[in-house]
Regions:
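Hydrophobic/aromatic residues located in beta-strands of well-ordered beta-sheets
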Residues: 5, 42, 113, 143-144
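Glycine-rich phosphate/pyrophosphate-binding loop and the adjoining helix
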Residues: 147-213
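N-terminal beta1-alpha1-beta2 submodule of the flavodoxin-like/Rossmannoid cofactor-binding fold
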Residues: 1-84, 90-97, 197-213
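Mobile beta-alpha loop/short-helix "lid" or hinge segments that flank ligand
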Residues: 43-54, 137-156
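Generic secondary-structure signature for well-ordered alpha-helical cores
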Residues: 30-35, 137, 141, 170-181
Length: 213
């Protein structure tokens, strides 16, 4: 069964270091999924091409344009997500955040996500841990342990970028090809899966018959 991975890249130019890193992560993920005996369809989403549509959506009561709605549906349907952004002012780009803000709040629940970022210097690498990981944790996505940061000096030189790329891709592949249903008796069902707790016993009933001693 073929899996699907959507790569969201928030680079503002073409070519860009953000797209270059996204390409490397996508290639490594294809290889990692293939190594597990599965195939994967990878689709790229260049957010700069949706910038006008996202702005229109933001100022029109969050009613997405047809183009943006199509992309959102692909993200929801994907088995995994690779999210790559440049670092601006010690955080992800506004373009990237706008796209995330326009997603349904439940769109990424349980979805495997690989996070990555690019910047001019290694000093910005903590953005992955203090901005991107908390963002996707809030959205209840499953973020792979290895996040990938690439500074300008990491491209074209002898660095450990390739090793980090392949390690992160392997972690994403493991989640993407995993069974979509849990082991019998352990998978959430019914109210658990929907997040509803079900009937709640009144506290006074719990204390009935107890004298407090």
């Amino acid at each position: 069964m073929s899996r699907s991975v959507v790569v969201i890249t928030a680079g503002l130019s073409s070519p860009s270091s953000t797209r270059l890193l996204a390409d490397q992560l996508a290639d490594a993920t294809r290889a990692a999924v293939g190594g597990r005996g599965e195939s994967v369809d990878v689709e790229f989403v260049e957010l700069r091409e949706l910038a006008v549509e996202m702005a229109q959506t933001m100022v029109s009561g969050n009613r997405p344009t047809p183009g943006l709605e199509t992309v959102q549906a692909k993200v929801v349907a994907a088995d995994g997500l690779i999210a790559v952004t440049p670092v601006f002012t010690a955080s992800y780009s506004g373009l990237f955040k706008t796209f995330v803000d326009l997603l349904d709040k439940d769109a990424l629940i349980g979805k495997p996500v690989l996070i990555a970022a690019t910047a001019g210097t290694p000093r910005h690498s903590l953005v992955l841990e203090h901005a991107m990981r908390p963002l996707f944790a809030y959205l209840r996505a499953v973020v792979v342990p290895t996040a990938v940061f690439a500074a300008t000096e990491d491209f074209g030189g002898e660095t450990d970028l390739e090793r980090r790329v392949h390690r992160a891709a392997g972690e994403l592949a493991a989640l993407v090809v995993a069974e979509r249903t849990g082991v019998a008796g352990f998978a959430p069902t019914g109210d658990e899966a929907s997040g509803t707790l079900g009937p709640v016993t009144d506290f006074s009933q719990l204390l009935r018959g107890h004298d407090g001693s």
